[in-house]
């Protein structure tokens, strides 16, 4: 089928299939072929690459990825969209459609099963996704903390979420999501995407980011789960000093004071001023 990345073709498909885009699932379809090409180029996809696409929608980006990649695995949760995808992607032998919830998918097992390799011999692969707001943080946590064999992710997210992922200590957008993303990856902006290139048109603009997965985290911690508990505690009550915010972890104040002193951190500082190494230092000292 011809490209669906045009307003006319997308609208025709929506009407033909009787589709009602669900706002609750962030179903805003990309209708600009130029943006589609830019996203695919950013992923640097070649004939030797396997790409997993989350939420392919009507298949606009899937079609472009399939023209470049060796294999595209597209995961779609919506049954009606899945049926439409079977038509828009017909004839593309290097595309595998998977009906399911990406939050519940073991990506390594899925890719290994389709490639016919054991998980121990699985090559790295890439992830491309247009993530709706409601699923951005949960899916990122699933993809990054599971330590799947992902080399890089190219994600389109709401602009405000993208800026949170990129934010540095002291900035208004800096938070727990910033720390998680930068702990596991090196994020970079690919392009800004105006709301006008979607149907239906969303209320906000989007940002495409490229997250290059680190071979090892940017800081060393003994217990990642505890490290992220410290991070979440620091940001859950942003107006509190780091001394008081960490009280939610259940430690005596004297223990927290000792940990902060050991890390060389003024207890009057607030969580949003702390860098990655400072959070790592706090988590290490609190555990001993």
From Swiss-Prot:
Q: Which Gene3D superfamilies match?
A: Ribosomal RNA adenine dimethylase-like, domain 2 (1.10.8.100), Vaccinia Virus protein VP39 (3.40.50.150)
Show the CDD domains listed in the entry.
Answer: AdoMet_MTases
Q: Where in the cell is it found?
A: Cytoplasm
Q: SMART domains from the xrefs?
A: rADc (SM00650)
Residue numbers binding S-adenosyl-L-methionine: 28, 30, 55, 76, 101, 130
In the Enzyme Commission scheme, what number(s) does this protein have?
A: 2.1.1.182
**Carries keyword GTP-binding?**
no
Report the top EC class in one word. Answer: transferase
Q: Which InterPro entries match?
A: KsgA/Erm, rRNA_Ade_diMease-like_C, rRNA_Ade_Mease_Trfase_CS, rRNA_Ade_methylase_Trfase_N, rRNA_adenine_dimethylase, SAM-dependent_MTases_sf
So what does this thing catalyse? adenosine(1518)/adenosine(1519) in 16S rRNA + 4 S-adenosyl-L-methionine = N(6)-dimethyladenosine(1518)/N(6)-dimethyladenosine(1519) in 16S rRNA + 4 S-adenosyl-L-homocysteine + 4 H(+)
Name the domain of life this protein comes from.
Answer: Bacteria
Please report which protein family the annotation says this sequence is part of. Answer: Belongs to the class I-like SAM-binding methyltransferase superfamily. rRNA adenine N(6)-methyltransferase family. RsmA subfamily.
What job does the chain carry out? Answer: Specifically dimethylates two adjacent adenosines (A1518 and A1519) in the loop of a conserved hairpin near the 3'-end of 16S rRNA in the 30S particle. May play a critical role in biogenesis of 30S subunits.
Q: What is this protein called?
A: Ribosomal RNA small subunit methyltransferase A
Q: Could you tell me which species this protein originates from?
A: Moorella thermoacetica (strain ATCC 39073 / JCM 9320)
């Amino acid at each position: 089928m011809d490209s669906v990345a045009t307003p006319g073709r997308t609208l025709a498909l929506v009407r033909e299939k009787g589709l009602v885009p669900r706002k609750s699932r962030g179903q805003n379809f990309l209708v600009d072929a130029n943006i589609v090409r830019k996203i695919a180029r950013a992923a640097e996809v070649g004939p030797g690459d396997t790409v997993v696409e989350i939420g392919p929608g009507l298949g606009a980006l899937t079609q472009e990825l399939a023209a470049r990649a060796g294999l595209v695995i597209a995961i779609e949760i919506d049954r009606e969209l899945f049926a439409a995808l079977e038509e828009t992607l017909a004839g593309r032998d290097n595309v595998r459609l998977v009906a399911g919830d990406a939050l519940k998918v073991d990506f390594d097992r899925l890719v290994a099963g389709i490639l016919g390799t054991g998980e121990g011999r699985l090559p790295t692969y890439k992830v491309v996704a247009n993530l709706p707001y409601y699923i951005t943080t949960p899916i990122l946590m699933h993809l990054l903390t599971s330590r799947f064999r992902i080399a890089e992710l190219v994600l389109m997210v709401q602009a405000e979420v993208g800026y949170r992922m990129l934010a540095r200590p002291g900035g208004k957008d800096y938070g727990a999501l910033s720390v998680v993303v930068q702990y596991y990856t090196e994020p970079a902006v690919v392009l800004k995407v105006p709301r006008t290139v979607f149907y239906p048109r969303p209320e906000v603009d989007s940002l495409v980011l490229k997250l290059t997965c680190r071979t090892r985290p940017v800081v060393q911690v003994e217990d990642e789960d505890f490290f992220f508990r410290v991070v979440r505690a620091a940001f859950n009550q942003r107006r509190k000093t780091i001394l008081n915010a960490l009280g939610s972890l259940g430690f005596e104040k004297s223990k927290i004071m000792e940990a902060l002193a050991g890390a060389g951190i003024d207890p009057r500082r607030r969580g949003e001023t702390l860098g990655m190494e400072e959070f790592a230092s706090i988590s290490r000292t609190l555990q001993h």
